[in-house]
């Protein structure tokens, strides 16, 4: 497991996944080269887009992308879809709202690609400074007001706001962001009564999500964390075995 940028939750989930599959796990510093590692699989997170694809070309082990810059976070996409399906919802035809910092979010790009492919209607909202200039080309509907994006939504995916974005002047202040784009109890009432609330974590309570929403009955945030272990176990199993003998797994 190689993390060029830190992520306590994902790293713990990945290590737990390997141990539950009766496999050993070692966390290696970036200075060790890919070619020198005698291992079956490498779980890698890197700040540069395309790093995992490059690693797959130069290294023999299976490469599992744990996030490469703002490009993709595949396992988060799988566990989000699993969490939604676990609640009995078929993604086709659902209204999905993604709110927040989409420009720098690998989770947003992954879920947009996955959800549109599964036939969902994806709506996005956030500060214009935190939306990609070509966001509409991804097959989503862009809203200036968060209320329009979440109205009648089946799923709301709330993205974490990194405070360094405010230091760069990409939004006025945390208080102003919470006032205009934060998901609180009043705004949540605009969505469907059985709306599923997702968040990749960790939450900035009182900023992009209120305390009440973060712990309401509709919030599946802790379920996402729990499902992360199971989904990553499945990914490791499938990639390491090629899916062979999967019928023998209880």
Regions found by a protein language model. Give the residues of each.
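Low-acidity, Ser/Thr- and Arg-rich intrinsically disordered low-complexity segments
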Residues: 2-27
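Phosphate/diphosphate ligand-binding glycine-rich loop within oxidoreductases
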Residues: 20-23, 28-82, 205
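Short, structured coil segments at secondary-structure junctions
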Residues: 58-60, 118, 136-139, 193, ...
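Glycine-rich phosphate/diphosphate-binding loop of Rossmann-like nucleotide-binding domains
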Residues: 86-159
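Adenosine-phosphate binding glycine-rich loop
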Residues: 194-250
């Amino acid at each position: 497991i190689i993390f060029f940028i830190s992520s306590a939750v994902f790293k713990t989930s990945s290590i737990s996944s390997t141990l539950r599959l009766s496999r050993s796990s070692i966390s290696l510093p970036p200075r060790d080269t890919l070619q020198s590692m005698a291992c079956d699989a490498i779980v890698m997170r890197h700040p540069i887009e395309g790093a995992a694809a490059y690693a797959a070309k130069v290294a023999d082990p299976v490469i599992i992308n744990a996030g490469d810059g703002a490009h993709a976070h595949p396992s988060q996409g799988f566990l989000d879809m699993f969490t939604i399906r676990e609640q009995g919802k078929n993604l086709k035809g659902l209204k999905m709202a993604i709110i927040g910092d989409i420009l720098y979010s690998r989770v947003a790009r992954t879920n947009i690609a996955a959800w549109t492919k599964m036939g969902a209607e994806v709506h996005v909202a956030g500060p214009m400074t935190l939306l990609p200039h070509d966001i509409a080309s991804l097959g989503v509907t862009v809203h200036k007001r968060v209320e329009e994006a979440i109205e009648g939504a089946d799923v709301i995916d709330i993205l974490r706001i990194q405070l360094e974005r405010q230091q760069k002047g990409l939004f006025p202040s945390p208080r102003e962001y919470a006032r205009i784009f934060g998901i609180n109890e009043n705004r949540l009432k605009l969505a469907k009564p059985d709306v599923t609330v997702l968040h990749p974590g960790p939450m900035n309570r009182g900023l992009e999500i209120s305390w009440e929403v973060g712990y309401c009955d509709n919030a599946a945030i802790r379920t996402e964390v729990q499902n992360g272990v199971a989904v990553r176990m499945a990914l490791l199993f499938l990639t390491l075995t090629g899916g062979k003998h999967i019928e023998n797994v209880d």
